[in-house]
Structure formats: C-alpha cells, structure tokens
Amino acid sequence: MRALIQRVHNARVEVEGAIVGQTGPGLLILLCAMAGDTEAEAEKLITKITKLRIFKDEAGKMNRSLLDIGGGALVVSQFTLSADTSRGNRPGFSAAAPPQEGEALYLHAVDLLRGHGVATQTGQFGADMDVHLVNDGPVTIWMDTSA
C-alpha cells in the first residue's frame, strides 16, 4: 500500500460541493491500494502512521505521534499514487489494485485507524473530490509497504 501523509491544521473533502469528511489538527492521508496488497500490509501501514513521531513536542521537536496528540485523520482514496511515469508522458495506473479490492483495503485501513482510537473521516471512494487543507509545517511523508 502507498500513502502520502500530510500534517495538517485542518482538512476537508467535498463531493459535488458538499463536505463529506473533515478533520482538525492531525493528518490528511492519501491512500492507494496496490495490486496484490493484503490486509496485513494495511495493518503494517496504519500502525506505522499512528506511531510516526511527526508532531511537535513542547520543545518544538518532532517527537509526538498522532496518538500522542489525540489528532484526527481524513483518509482520501488516491489511486493515482500508483502512477508509473517511466514511459512516455501519460502516467499508467495498472499497478493499482482493481477497484473492488482497492475499496475493501481502503475501508479496512479506515477501520484500523478507528480501532487505534483515531477520530477518522473519509472521502468518497472512486468519486471526483475537492480536497482542501492547511498544511502544518509543511510536513509531507511518502510511505510504501513494498519499499
């Protein structure tokens, strides 16, 4: 699985002008299930995300996790994270999991976040979405369970 995580002051996602998910301080997680991914990879990724020490402590050092700060998460499906740009000028997305498998893994990842006690909201799988965010830092981290 692949994720692009961004530390945010706040974020929201809209579908057809209506807000479908939002969070205050915490993480915006753009998530992509890759072909062949399993629930075990989702578990590995989500556990790492919840424990990653990327929030500032009292001294201003990145030393606190999402769990430590009681932050929220907004999870948005993002199959374009599977882009292969090695040939030509048009990205290929064949490395992404098929939609049905991708959605199941996406929903599993969301359930895992909630199971860790993270207040989690989502976008709408497969929809065209407008994502609004206010970066904190900015802190943006690429994660890939196959790397």
Swiss-Prot record:
Looking up CDD domains in the UniProt record yields:
Dtyr_deacylase (cd00563)
Give its localization. Cytoplasm
Q: Quote the catalytic activity from the record.
A: glycyl-tRNA(Ala) + H2O = tRNA(Ala) + glycine + H(+); a D-aminoacyl-tRNA + H2O = a tRNA + a D-alpha-amino acid + H(+)
Alphabetic keyword roster: Cytoplasm, Hydrolase, RNA-binding, tRNA-binding
Where does this chain carry the motif Gly-cisPro motif, important for rejection of L-amino acids? 137-138
Q: Which GO terms describe its molecular function?
A: D-tyrosyl-tRNA(Tyr) deacylase activity; Gly-tRNA(Ala) deacylase activity; Ser(Gly)-tRNA(Ala) hydrolase activity; tRNA binding
Show the GO cellular component annotation of the record: cytoplasm
Which terms does the UniProt entry file under GO BP? D-amino acid catabolic process
Among Pfam families, the record links this protein to: Tyr_Deacylase (PF02580)
Q: What is its EC number?
A: 3.1.1.96
Q: Which HAMAP family match?
A: Deacylase_Dtd
Could you say which protein family the record assigns here? Belongs to the DTD family.
**Record's subunit section:** Homodimer.
Domain remark text: A Gly-cisPro motif from one monomer fits into the active site of the other monomer to allow specific chiral rejection of L-amino acids.
Tell me, in a sentence or two, what this protein's role is: An aminoacyl-tRNA editing enzyme that deacylates mischarged D-aminoacyl-tRNAs. Also deacylates mischarged glycyl-tRNA(Ala), protecting cells against glycine mischarging by AlaRS. Acts via tRNA-based rather than protein-based catalysis; rejects L-amino acids rather than detecting D-amino acids in the active site. By recycling D-aminoacyl-tRNA to D-amino acids and free tRNA molecules, this enzyme counteracts the toxicity associated with the formation of D-aminoacyl-tRNA entities in vivo and helps enforce protein L-homochirality.
NCBIfam families this protein is in? Answer: D-aminoacyl-tRNA deacylase
Protein name according to UniProt: D-aminoacyl-tRNA deacylase
Q: Which gene encodes it?
A: dtd
